[in-house]
Amino acid sequence: MSDLHAVDTVALAALEADLAQQLALVDSFGPDWTRPRTHPEGHVHDVVIVGGGQSGLATAFGLKRERINNILVLDENPEGFEGPWETYARMITLRTPKGLTPIDYGLPALTPQAWFTACFGAAAWDALDKIPRGVWMEYLRWYRRVLNLPLRNDARVTGITPAGDGVYRVALADGATLLARKVVLATGIQGGGEWHTPAMIRENLPRHAYAHTSEPIDLAALEGKRVGILGGGASAFDNANHALAQGVGEVHVFMRRKALPRINPIRFMERVGFTARYPALSDAEKYRAMAAFLSHNQPPTNDTFNRAASWPGFALHLGSPWNEVAHEDGQVIVTTPHDRFAFDFVILSTGLISDPRLRPELAALAPHIALWGDVVAMPEGERNALIDAHPYLGPAFEFTPRAPADAALLHGLFAFNYSALISLGLSASALSGMKNALPRLVRGIADQLFLDDREALLAQFIAYDEEEFVGEWPRPASAVEAAA
């Protein structure tokens, strides 16, 4: 799991018993209230959640607490490797404060602190600065197991299309299809668009000469060699430190900015309630706030920077954008305003672009999805192409239509991934915001399911005639005699 000592299985079992009692006390689970749907193509799930990382798991738990149990979570990765933590994330620890409680829904026994303390002891928690990446993944594995969440692994979604009667058809890479009334895209930081690879790189380098930080990288093949990293955000330093720790000879980080990023606006958001109250802002206020947010590169954590900078093979080049790249004699040649460099391999820490038109699973629906650029008018000097490409979401993370005629196509489709940033702030894919975002999403899904069936439910309610009171008056003689 990590360099922490072995798990205290007795304490963990006691915690799980406490959790079971807490769940029972707050009546977390119960029979479904939703009305079953039938479809000629097969079983109809009330909700299919695409993505089995922290967002998908927590969404599933929230729905079960609302007594919506006809659900299924899908993840393209093998069991235990959902999300980025054991696939491409290379930071040593999470970047968020250890005391956050993002996915526990207020249940003390489900918090990361309760689990960590049960596993490793209170002293280990007190000594902890931030939660190690691998330990966080172990918490998520436990979360899935202890809550018995319905997750199907090795299931990659390739398409989402309307199947009629308020149902979506969810196509999988293996040829199977599923049906669902609601589909939640809990697809992480990249799930609302794609990782950005600059055209200069795509057009001038062979594919084997570079990788994005979001991709697997064979660092063993780079032992003793020279690697260049384009970009100066947190992931650049995560990858630099990780590569050097794996035996890479030199790592050079190149930043366009002339100074290291020092301000992390997320910390301000956490302090003043920005994460919880952001959705109440007007569109223009959101636009300006997120323009400021996107102007910052998230800085590395201090410990990650210090680790990376302590390696003899580490170099940092400020004010050094890549003006040209070329592939010559098996090496990547990088030209900056100041010098020329030769590398055996380069890594791109160039961020991502959120745009539903880039998602292959949304190919049939993306033309009908409203974007911020379609909906919000800003003065010409304030327009931001990155913001304009984000989907314009409703208050419960639901996609909204570009035209009123498109409403039925999108009704029931939710974007609980990083593309929600502009509409709803730090929420999905951001541990700092999930505590507030999850109830909003779950309530919105439950409301839709209820309102979709309101005519039938109201008719049943009006016709309801099940008698509960069984007393009689005048009282029968037998009852009077028994009372005497």
For every predicted segment, state its role.
Residues 90-122, 267-281:
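Flavin (FAD/FMN) cofactor-binding and adjacent substrate-gating region
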Residues 80-90:
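Core mature regions of organelle-targeted
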Residues 2-77, 82, 125-246, 252-484:
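Flavin (primarily FAD) cofactor-binding/catalytic cores of flavoenzymes
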Residues 87, 98-99, 166, 330:
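Intrinsic-disorder/low-complexity loop/linker signature
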